[in-house]
Amino acid sequence: MKIYEVTFNWNGENEVHSFWENAQSSVEKFIENMTRRGDLVFVSKRLVKEI
């Protein structure tokens, strides 16, 4: 399992989400789902810890 910090930009403000990646959920899918509506813009992802 990997823990990521994913940063999005919303109305000029950065917003950081923690995301736990496992076999059922990938960080790329999470980013795709979060940005689908168009008001969040993906900024960066950072691997915090691998368990």
Regions found by a protein language model. Give the residues of each.
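Short aromatic-glycine-(Arg/Gly/Cys) micro-motifs in beta-strand/loop hairpins
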Residues: 1-15
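A short, exposed loop/beta-hairpin motif centered on an aromatic-Gly-Thr core
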Residues: 13-25
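Short, surface-exposed linear segments at secondary-structure transitions and domain or protein termini
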Residues: 24-33
